[in-house]
Curated annotation (Swiss-Prot):
It comes from the Bacteria. Homodimer. The active site is at H9 (tele-phosphohistidine intermediate), E87 (proton donor/acceptor). Catalyzes the interconversion of 2-phosphoglycerate and 3-phosphoglycerate. SMART domains: PGAM. Pathway: Carbohydrate degradation; glycolysis; pyruvate from D-glyceraldehyde 3-phosphate: step 3/5. Its EC number is 5.4.2.11. GO terms for biological process: gluconeogenesis; glycolytic process. Gene3D superfamilies: Phosphoglycerate mutase-like. Pfam families: His_Phos_1. This is 2,3-bisphosphoglycerate-dependent phosphoglycerate mutase. Substrate binds at residues 8-15, 21-22, 60, 87-90, 98, 114-115, 183-184. Keywords: Gluconeogenesis, Glycolysis, Isomerase.
Amino acid sequence: MYKLVLIRHGESTWNKENRFTGWVDVDLTEQGRNEAYQAGALLKEAGYTFDIAYTSVLKRAIRTLWHVQDKMDLMYLPVVHSWRLNERHYGALSGLNKAETAAKFGDDQVLVWRRSYDTPPPALEPTDERAPFSDPRYAKVPREQLPLTECLKDTVARVLPLWNESIAPAVRAGKQVLIAAHGNSLRALIKYLDGISDSDIVGLNIPNGVPLVYELDENLKPIQHYYLGDQDAIAKAQAAVAKQGKAG
């Protein structure tokens, strides 16, 4: 049996402000830093250790990983930073308040943009300052692979090559792997691992800063998965994530 640990970054400044973030590189709040430290404490207390970690190129995930490493005394851990683990690109919604957007376009439309599998939000113009083309962290990524908007289907398509070519081989080699990423890049991976249908994935909400453990068989198929921590608090956090895109 193999184990894989996933963690969504701690609360970011735009999570706190209920704004669509996507590829915008916002930082953690004080609460977010505390969530990351608590995640590290939970993992250490439960006896976990790691051989390698994967994260995105966005600081809210990177800093979450730093705090987990610090709390676990694993600052030496090899880390792979990949744009493929970035949050889903929210296109022209990037920076907008979710509740205000829902009040303008309706809860149903915003739910489709936030959680449906194959409907992306309106795209950015290529000349928009939020477009990733001139960002140095993507200098080695072919321009045609850089998005101006994404649906979850697009996010799955960019996450899976990293899983197939790097993460899965590391797990099969017996390495203890930690992935610190984002709500939708993790939803993309979980959809693949658990075989969740395109329609059912809309109901999957991942709380900030809570370790999610996957136990996998020899074929890397899930045996079971579970969150570490207070289960009632985790359920409330998941419900709060689900409410973010509603007007009321």
